[in-house]
């Protein structure tokens, strides 16, 4: 290689921008009074974070079998959530969901009261500890799989707390899966307690919604085992004239899909935050 070519190569290399994600990741320990135990959460703060400004917050829930660290450790690009937090200037909170809590208050197990924990105790902790917008205009919630169910469930039932919600590959109807993911341990057996399964399936909570009260985004891959129940939820929302974004594309139930989907969801929430706070 000629000297002039080497020089050109060096110049080109030095001109390539280096992207640094400066978002900070805290692991915090919260205490649940209702469950009488400590629960961990990851909190991602954007590089622009300052106590002098109030930041919107996204609550990002993990799936069955996962934990609070999944969203910063399991996506193909482990910087995904940090990068999006930086780019969109939002705080991201990833709580632990007790492996298979399904994010509701179990009627049979007092150690699984995750609806109360996430929608009340955790939100109060975050608003006290961090500089956040402390009303529904600055809060969104989404998640994957079990967390997708949980996010919609909590937002539908607590519209005074969350202004926007989403789901990625969410298990939005529990009833087709009576033997899976410890749901029966939280609600009792389906054939013995069908009313509990009905009452705690997101697809049966659309009557709580009124048009334009909640910003809603639902995403599920066509190869996902939850695809049919997501289409059914979409159809039910359409029948009730509830505006929402519904995304479906080729994909299955894995982090490759969710690592892509979360970018669309966070952009959607960023637009909601900007619009609602104007």
Where do the protein language model's features map onto the residues?
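Sec-dependent signal peptide recognition
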Residues: 2-12
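Non-catalytic cap/lid and distal C-terminal segments of serine-dependent acyl enzymes
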Residues: 22-278
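Hydrophobic h-region of N-terminal signal peptides that target proteins for export
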Residues: 12-21
């Amino acid at each position: 290689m000629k000297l002039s070519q080497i020089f050109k190569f060096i110049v080109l290399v030095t001109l390539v921008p280096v992207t640094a994600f400066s978002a900070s990741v805290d692991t915090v320990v919260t205490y649940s009074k209702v469950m009488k135990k400590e629960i961990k959460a990851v909190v991602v703060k954007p590089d622009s974070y300052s106590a002098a400004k109030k930041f919107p917050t996204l609550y990002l829930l993990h799936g069955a079998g996962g934990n609070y660290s999944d969203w910063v450790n399991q996506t193909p690009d482990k910087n995904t959530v940090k990068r999006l937090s930086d780019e969109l200037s939002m705080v991201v909170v990833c709580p632990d969901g007790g492996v298979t809590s399904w994010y509701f208050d179990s009627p049979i197990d007092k150690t699984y009261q995750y609806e109360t924990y996430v929608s009340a105790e955790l939100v109060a902790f975050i608003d006290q500890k961090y500089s956040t917008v402390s009303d529904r205009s600055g809060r969104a919630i989404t998640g994957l799989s079990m967390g997708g169910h949980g996010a919609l469930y909590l937002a539908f039932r607590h519209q005074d707390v969350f202004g926007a919600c989403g789901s990625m590959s969410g298990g939005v109807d529990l009833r087709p899966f009576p033997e899976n993911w410890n749901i029966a341990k939280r609600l009792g057996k389906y054939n013995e307690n069908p009313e509990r399964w009905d009452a705690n399936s997101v697809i049966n909570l659309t009557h709580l919604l009124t048009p334009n009260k909640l910003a809603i985004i639902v995403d599920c891959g066509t190869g996902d085992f939850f695809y049919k129940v997501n289409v059914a939820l979409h159809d039910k929302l359409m029948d009730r004239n509830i505006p929402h974004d519904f995304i479906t594309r080729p994909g299955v139930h894995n982090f490759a899909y969710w690592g892509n989907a979360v970018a669309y969801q966070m952009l959607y929430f960023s637009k909601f935050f900007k619009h609602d706070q104007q």
